[in-house]
Amino acid sequence: MRLFGVVVVAMAGALVVSGCASGSEAAVPTDPVAFSETVTVDAVTGHLEQLEKIAANNEGNRSAGTPGYDASVDYVANLLEDKGFEVSTPEFDFSSFDPGTESLKAADGSDVPVRALTYSTSTGPTGITARLVAIPADETPGCEATDYDGRDVNGAIVLVTRGVCPFGDKQKIAADRGAAALLVANNEDAMLGGATLGEPEDARIPTGGVSKASGEALAAAPGDLTLILDTSTETTKSRNVIAQTKTGATDNVVVVGAHLDSVPEGPGINDNGSGTAAVLETALQMGSAPSIENAVRFAFWGAEEVGLVGSTRYVEGLSDQERADIALYLNFDMLGSPNAGYLAYDGDNSDAVGEGPGPEGSAGIERTFVDFLAGRGIAADGTDFDGRSDYGPFIEIGIPAGGVFSGADERKTPAQAEKWGGEAEETFDPNYHSAQDNLANIDREALAANASAVAFGVATYAQDVSGPNGVPVGDARTQARTE
């Protein structure tokens, strides 16, 4: 998926909006705390209601390449234009996946519901029949080559449990060990939905998802399985939505992003209507020509759910100077999980979990959000930069990043449940990537706190990107990104 040279370069050029255009807007409060109070949960919920209606009118989803997504683009773009923003909706190509026939027969001949992971290779119409090898769940379920030690999986259909690492990593490790196909069992009592292997070129073996109960039943009765995943992938188009303030320095741009698409399985109201709605309302409250020191570029990404495609194509298309002009990136993806966590991206790697720290300046961004939530009586935890959201392409090129997050398919620990409430040992969002990701299942309290955090973070860096919680500027920025 690196076939966009001319198209993407032209797209990126269109995204650098001039700071000298005319327009009259109310000034943003110079006090970020005061500004945070202007982004209310009622207003954010109003946007979620509209996104849910869009999904309901378009086969229940807003996934990339569908009429539901196009209607979501129009909704966001029209509101921004009405507020005086110059809005662009640049197109990009991405790979559209068709799962085709999906079938799994257990050793006893019974049918087991199965769903192909996005970009899975095809078994062909007749499928694969092979013995099942179940990899026991541990702290790294199928995420490390050592999980396969002592097990012959050559030519087998391997079963692993969801969690800890991306599905593409699980698939790669199974393929490296010679597996003919992979099944991933959910860690909740539901079908595994909305899962992706990353990008088409990452796909090596047929990979399907099953429910937790099905996974347990399969593991308890090993034998030969027959798997049919007659998949196909084709190139189609989607769009980002980009709008930048007409005021503020254009060599210290604050980019604020949220992905606009849902998975095909549902309306995507938490993932990621919540982030979209909070960023959109922040933009509307700020206006197109506020009294700020640094320009703010609001970005609503397409095709995140199929491999961060919109944000990746955007970053790939930026010139060296355009990259240097971006001071930092703020990412907001899932802000109202029903078993909510209060998480800030771990910019300094103080949690020492998974990946290392973000680029220089990310630690300060983390402190900005942690301190804001602390002021509301909320003790936030860190969350790893694990590459599962649109900050990924930015940190890859050295741009500091941060944001808040209410949790997805990770489990809430007993310590977290004690300080935040909710259910320990249950996932933050049991409706993740399902038809139940709807407005009725949004935690309004978490949404209110996190939406205010969005506004606070944006206003903070719109006024000043330096200081104790700032990011490198000038020569220090150049040096930090070339080391």
Describe the residue ranges of each PLM region.
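C-terminal region of N-terminal signal peptides and the immediate post-cleavage residues
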Residues: 4, 15-30, 467
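Noncatalytic luminal/extracellular "stalk/propeptide" segments of secretory-pathway proteins
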Residues: 27, 37, 46-49, 53-152
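Second-shell loop/turn segments in exported
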Residues: 30-40, 57-68, 134, 138, ...
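Catalytic-core environment of secreted peptidases
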Residues: 38-59, 66, 79-83, 143-145, ...
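Extracellular/luminal Protease-associated
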Residues: 66, 113-211, 267, 380
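Soluble metallo-hydrolase cores and metallopeptidase-like ectodomains found primarily
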Residues: 119-143, 199-269, 281-284, 288, ...
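Metal-dependent peptidase/peptidase-like ectodomains
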Residues: 291, 301-412
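His/Asp/Glu-rich mid-to-C-terminal helical/loop segments that flank catalytic regions of hydrolases
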Residues: 411-482
